[in-house]
From Swiss-Prot:
Binding site for ATP: K277
Description of how the protein assembles with itself and partners: Monomer.
Localization per record: Cytoplasm
Official protein name in the record: Cysteine--tRNA ligase
Entry-linked SUPFAM superfamilies: Anticodon-binding domain of a subclass of class I aminoacyl-tRNA synthetases, Nucleotidylyl transferase
GO cellular component term of the entry, any: cytosol
Keywords: Aminoacyl-tRNA synthetase, ATP-binding, Cytoplasm, Ligase, Metal-binding, Nucleotide-binding, Protein biosynthesis, Zinc
This enzyme's EC code(s): 6.1.1.16
Species annotation: Methylibium petroleiphilum (strain ATCC BAA-1232 / LMG 22953 / PM1)
Catalysed reactions, as listed in the record: tRNA(Cys) + L-cysteine + ATP = L-cysteinyl-tRNA(Cys) + AMP + diphosphate
UniProt similarity note: Belongs to the class-I aminoacyl-tRNA synthetase family.
Database matches in CDD domains: Anticodon_Ia_Cys (cd07963), CysRS_core (cd00672)
Cofactor note: Binds 1 zinc ion per subunit.
Length: 461
């Protein structure tokens, strides 16, 4: 196939070929669900939503796993603060996540495992690492991974093990043989609630974060799979430690690794600064959905390549909204011929070439604008159908154009229609001052009225 993907492990863009012909298995690190998802989470899930969509468009069967971390120090702390069971908190936050990302058109994965459902698999994996001489128990009940015993540690992140310093994104715990070692099993603390403790041969406790993903990916995708994704911030230590665990358990001396292609999306900033609650620029998905519709947010994110740094700003969102409206305006009032995509069409061929080049959505979006220009000139039903179909592979332009242009920006359509009716009544009564006042008030809200022989219509400016 013609698809090429940038592999973080090799630092090169490579031709992609799945291990099993015709079937792609992909794992993406999902949310730790103690709070609402923020726009950085949205950026990550959007990136891999596009990946899985394009793999399917390319004729491949996709098994897509995106996990949920539902046991963690932050989760325990938040549940205690609220005085509720951990499961109640994580169920609530999972439902909120599904609602929020659904508004952005992010499709559900094939499997969405919760870490707490795989604790037995995690315990079994830790026991394999013990037998392989890579894990050791310490007084108090913790089990740690011996980093220096794993050959090749640091190859994903490019970090030399001797150059790594204790404390560089690695928690230093008492009882470690080496400051770089990381925890596989955390012994229970007396003050922790009962629902944070699980039984294991090492003693009661809970799994470390890193072992969770190794166990879940192995349980659902097997010892080797095609793509592992996540945010750039997970490259070290999380993904580095996953390699140490999974390869240390199943691939020592085999010449293979458990993942063929590692993908990482770029960092997100807000107004060119790191997103931080202390800076007052921290936004949840829900915060943004109060001001912009989900498709505008999606379109905004797809105008930047998934590996590039992404600057989140109101100016960028406003520009994206205008751009999306231009695309929908091209479809407004034009018959749209439903049809399979003809990939030999020049526009379709350019779109495919862009997406096959490491999912280059900015170039693909530029093709949509070129095609919209052709639709505006020709009013061709076939061109309009192609525009909608190509955009649909990205999760865009699937609403009726008139409906989106009127209501796609979260406006109160009932209020607007009532104001239009009031304006019509004022005009009929020859109260032109009132008619103009209503028109101007709507214009101030970004609503532009169009008077036609058939009546008054409106669009969001």
């Amino acid at each position: 196939m013609s698809l090429r993907i940038h592999n973080t492990l090799t630092r090169s863009t490579e031709a992609f070929s799945p291990i099993e012909p015709g079937h792609v298995r992909m794992y993406v690190c999902g949310m730790t669900i103690y709070d609402l998802c923020h726009v950085g989470h949205a950026r990550m899930m959007m990136a891999f939503d596009v990946v899985q969509r394009w793999l399917r468009v390319s004729g491949l069967r996709v098994t897509y796993v995106r996990n949920i971390t539902d046991i963690d120090d932050k989760i325990i702390k938040r549940a205690l603060e609220r005085g509720i069971p951990i499961r109640q908190l994580t169920d609530e936050m999972t439902a909120a996540m599904h609602q929020d990302i659904g508004a952005l058109g992010i499709e559900p994965p094939t499997h969405e495992p919760r870490a707490t459902e795989y604790v037995g698999a995690m315990v079994g994996l830790i026991e394999v690492l013990e037998r392989n001489g890579l894990a050791y128990r310490v007084p108090g009940g913790d089990v740690n991974y011996s980093v220096r015993k794993f050959p090749g540690y640091g190859r994903l992140s490019g970090k030399s093990i001797d150059a790594l310093r204790a404390g560089e994104r690695v928690a230093v715990l008492e009882g470690k043989d080496d400051p770089l070692d990381f925890v596989l099993w955390k012994a229970a603390k007396p003050e922790e609630p009962a629902d944070a403790k699980y039984d294991a041969p090492f003693g009661p406790g809970r799994p470390g974060w890193h072992i969770e993903c190794s166990a879940m990916s192995h349980a659902l995708l097997g010892e080797r799979f095609d793509i592992h994704g996540g945010g750039m911030d997970l490259q070290f230590p999380h993904h580095e430690n996953e390699i140490a665990q999974s390869d240390g358990a199943f691939h020592l001396g085999s010449g293979h690794s458990f993942v063929n292609v590692w993908m990482h999306n770029g960092f997100l900033n807000v107004d060119n600064e790191k997103m931080s609650k202390s800076l007052g620029n921290f936004f949840t998905i829900r915060d943004i959905l109060k001001r912009y519709d989900g498709e505008t947010i999606r379109f905004f994110m797809l105008r930047v390549h998934y590996r590039s740094p992404f600057n989140f700003s109101d100016a960028g969102l406003d520009d994206a909204r205008s751009g999306l409206r231009r695309l929908y305006t091209a479809l407004e009032g034009t018959a749209v011929a439903p049809a399979e995509i003809d990939w030999t069409d020049p526009h379709a061929a350019r779109f495919k070439a862009a997406m096959d080049d490491d999912f280059n959505t900015p170039i693909a979006v530029s093709v949509l604008f070129d095609l919209a220009g052709e639709v505006n000139r020709s009013r061709s039903a076939q061109s309009a159908g192609l525009l909608r179909s190509l955009a649909g592979t990205l999760g865009l332009l699937q609403q009726e154009a008139a409906q989106y242009l009127q209501g796609g920006s979260g406006v109160d359509t009932g209020h607007i229609e009532a104001q239009i009716a009031a304006r019509a009544a004022a005009k009929a009564a020859r109260d032109f001052a009132e008619s103009d006042r209503i028109r101007d008030a709507l214009a101030a809200q970004g609503i532009v009225l169009k008077d036609t022989p058939a009546g008054t219509t409106w669009v969001k400016a």
